[in-house]
């Protein structure tokens, strides 16, 4: 295995009671990303996306005065089945890690299977917690109806 391919892999799964098309779209919409792509104590997030293969994205997660920038490039966009992108941040030692997400149709909605590869071993637990929290927030947002009280 080359140094570029080295690292750890984690898998996070969650069923969200919303159709695949809607869940998939949430991953490519900057306004939507800014609402749920904020794990743990993050209070806000901003996102810029160019949703095409080879397009880039930038997400800045905000926790008080601190800013955590994440960036990457879309490698695969197959609506509503699969999304794959590089994920680069300070937490990954500014190395390109790879996130692949499968959107599986289930009776209860959509099962997300997120596989994050090439992670530094020291970051597996924190990324597992972060992705789990992000999926919970995505589920809450996806299930909400802005018109309801």
Region locations from a protein language model:
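Hydrophobic ligand-binding cavity/cleft-lining segments
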Residues: 1-43
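A conserved amphipathic terminal alpha-helix motif
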Residues: 5, 117-149
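Short beta-edge strand/loop motif at the mouth of beta-sheet-based domains
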Residues: 11-12, 31-67, 149
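Hydrophobic/aromatic beta-strand elements that line small-molecule binding cavities or substrate pockets
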Residues: 14, 47, 70-76, 87, ...
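A short, structured loop/turn motif at beta-sheet edges
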Residues: 20-21, 75-81, 102-111
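Hydrophobic pocket/interface hotspot
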Residues: 23, 33, 57, 74, ...
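Short, solvent-exposed secondary-structure boundary/capping segments
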Residues: 81-88
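Short, solvent-exposed aromatic-acidic interface loops
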Residues: 88-93, 115-122
């Amino acid at each position: 295995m080359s140094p570029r391919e080295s690292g750890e892999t984690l898998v996070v799964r969650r069923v969200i009671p919303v159709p695949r098309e809607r869940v998939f779209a949430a991953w490519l919409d900057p306004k939507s990303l800014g609402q749920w792509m904020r794990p743990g104590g993050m209070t806000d997030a901003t996102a810029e996306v160019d949703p095409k293969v080879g397009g880039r994205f930038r997400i800045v997660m905000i926790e008080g005065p601190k800013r955590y920038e994440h960036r990457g490039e879309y490698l695969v966009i197959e609506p509503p089945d699969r999304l794959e992108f590089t994920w680069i941040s300070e937490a990954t030692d500014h190395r390109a890690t790879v996130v692949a997400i499968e959107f599986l149709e289930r009776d209860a909605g959509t099962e997300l299977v997120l596989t994050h590869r090439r992670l530094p071993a020291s970051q597996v637990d924190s990324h597992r917690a972060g992705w789990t929290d992000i999926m919970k927030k995505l589920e809450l947002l996806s299930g909400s109806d802005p018109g309801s009280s």
